[in-house]
Every structure is written in C-alpha cells, then in structure tokens.
Amino acid sequence: MVPLNRSGATTRNDSVESLHKKALKSQKDGNQEEAVLNLDRALEIEPNNAELLYDKAISFQMLLRFDDAIEYYDKSLRIDPNNFGAFVNKGLCLSNPNMNRYEDALECFEQALRLVPNDPGALSLKGYSLDSVGRYREAIDCFDKILQTQPKETNIIINKGLALSHLGKYDEAIAYFDTVLDYEPDNFFAMQLKQEAVNSMKRDFLQ
C-alpha cells in the first residue's frame, strides 16, 4: 500500500524519491547491493523512470556486472535517448577488457559526442577504443582535439605517444613521452613507454 501524507493524499512520488535517496546514499557509501534493492523497490512503483534505471545500471557497473549494467543503460536510453552519461558509461562497460567489445563501445562514445561535441572525456575514451581496434590515426585525431584545448594533459599526451608507437613512428612517440617527463619527471608509465619505443626503434634498425 502506498502511504498517505499529512493531507491524506498518497505519497507515491515521495516514496520513489525516498527510495531513490536511500539508493544514492548506498551508492556513495559503496553498498551497491543495497542500492539495487532500493532502486528495485522504487521501480516497482515507477518502472519507466529513466533516472532510476540509469542509477541501477551504475550500481551494476560498480559491481562489475557489465551485462546487467548494459541492459539497464539500454532501458534508460529507450526512455531518455539524450542521456550523455548513459552512452559514456555503457561504452565504458563494453570497452572493459573483460568484455572486449571495443567496436560497440565506439558507437556509444560517438553517440555521446553527438550530444556533447568535443567533450574531452568522451573523446579520450573514443580515442582509446580506436587505438584498441588498430585505428591508430583516428585515435590520434581524437587526442589532438583534446590537446588543442588541454595541451598539458599528460594522460592524453601519453595516449597519443602510444598510438604513434603502434604506427611505428617511434621518434615522434619518444618526443611525446619526453614532453610528459618534462612536466612529470617521475611519471613511470611515460618512462616505461619511452624505453619500449627506444627498444623497438633499435630492433627495426638492426633488421
């Protein structure tokens, strides 16, 4: 039975709001199972609430239940097809190494970028997925777009250097890794990738 408020009217929406707040608190506290339970209770009242479906997907994603997360992102997107975050998060699930569905992830990031063109986060994820499927030049294009406005973003500089390494352009890659090391001398990842590029360049020279 839906409870009554002080005026005697039913509090259907208040019940959903209360359950949703409990779920969000559980999410914040790291208790995703409890969040899912509260979201399920809220969805019994409002089964087509896109926000509830989206938040349930987030909890499943945090639990590494990627198939379930994708299912609920899809349900949310059928109701609210303009949810930028749902496309990005669905893409993150698909591009997780355990899923290894980079082409499908690319479609999600492209949909997200149609909604918010040139968003740095979506561009970065698109670039990473392009690199993962061997489309290195397109990946570099994504990273370049970010670097136009964030020229000192070291993670993006590293990703561009890595894509250049994959293309066999080791001299250029090393220059990008050196740029990172100028900004962050203790960046171990840049050191490691630079050494790998140097080793690859030496192997190519000896062949």
Stretch-by-stretch model annotation:
Residues 2-18:
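TPR-adjacent "capping" and linker segments in tetratricopeptide-repeat scaffold/adaptor proteins
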Residues 13-51, 55-64, 95:
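Alpha-helical segment of the N-proximal tetratricopeptide repeat
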Residues 28-38, 62-75, 97-111, 132-145, ...:
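Structural signature of tandem alpha-helical TPR/SEL1-like repeats
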